[in-house]
Amino acid sequence: MSILEIIGRDQELFTSDIEFFSKEISERVKRSKFLVIGGAGSIGQAVTKEIFKRDPQALHVVDISENNMVELVRDLRSTEGYGSGDFKTFAIDCGSVEFEALMASEGPYEYVFNLSALKHVRSESDPYTLMRMIMVNVFNIIKTLRLANKMGAKKYFCVSTDKAANPVNMMGASKRIMEMFLMRESMTQDISMARFANVAFSDGSLLHGFNQRFSKRQPFAAPNDVRRYFVTPQESGELCLLSGLLGNNRDIFFPKLSEKLHLITFSEIAVRYLRERGYEPYECESEDEARDRAEELIAKKQWPCYFFKSDTTGEKDFEEFFTDNEDLDMERFETVGV
């Protein structure tokens, strides 16, 4: 299955910059120790793979998901083999005392990449998960940055989101607050960030849900009025790597808009996905109809779909990567704006 074809593209976004800076990136990776926080999530795994395949001096990965961490190790061993450097994984929370002990005993690290986040707009619908979102997206970032600074890290990278530009929901606002705190901390610690679009088929995403629905022979449901930019998992790792290794202090990287990157609706992706799998989408009038006719339609190589107008409170009508009052550098890279 071609992710690029499903999201309506035929070219990868960052190839030219990755190739142009390949030697510099590889040399920095080979002589450095890395800590990746949230490394077993979708973006975290992509970043870990980009670092691992360039044979770092040391690569330590932290994530609270023990199962995802096990799969990450299996994936790396199956695709990249074994590097010559020190590779370790730790199933711990970056906000815990165990993490502080890890930093004290396993550090120092030249580069700290923090990919941990609560990223779903729906997570702000109750006060308890919202409190957790603020803890993860703001306070844990500050804590881990100060620990990195204390041990003399060369760079602290943190992933942000396009929703931090003129935020309209608490998820985006929490990331914007994070950016503001990091700018303050940049007085004593070099930092860089990246804002980018939806990562196609990332854990918990609607596209990841398509995989789940397909494997369980269940109907597809998707909004037909929400248009989004999508990057592949590999592209998410490449953008983070470019920012973390080549970004100057306080830089925020984002994908340049071009003919390669364009908006596409979730319903369009659902149609492309099903046709890629050999099924013709059959649009139903309701979710009930889609559920009731699932077995009948699937047997005829048709897949029941229900497309609707979005009802998720706080969803942004459009996506943007920067605001009018931010200084832009569109010349330094071919495919990335800063």
Where are these regions (language model features)?
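Rossmann-fold cofactor-recognition segment
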Residues: E80-S96
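Non-catalytic terminal and boundary segments that flank Rossmann-like NAD(P)-dependent oxidoreductase
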Residues: M1-F34
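Hydrophobic/small residue at the entry helix of a nucleotide-binding pocket
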Residues: I43
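Conserved glycine-rich cofactor-binding loop
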Residues: A40
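Conserved Rossmann-fold NAD(P)-dependent oxidoreductase catalytic core, especially the SDR/UDP-sugar
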Residues: N114, L118-E179, R184
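NAD(P)H-binding glycine-rich loop region in Rossmannoid oxidoreductase-like domains
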Residues: A46, E50-V61, R77, C94-M133
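Strand-loop microenvironment adjacent to phosphate/nucleotide-handling motifs in alpha/beta enzyme folds
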Residues: I6-I7, E24, L182-V338
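Helix N-cap at the beta1-alpha1 junction of Rossmann-like dinucleotide-binding domains, i.e.
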Residues: D63-N68
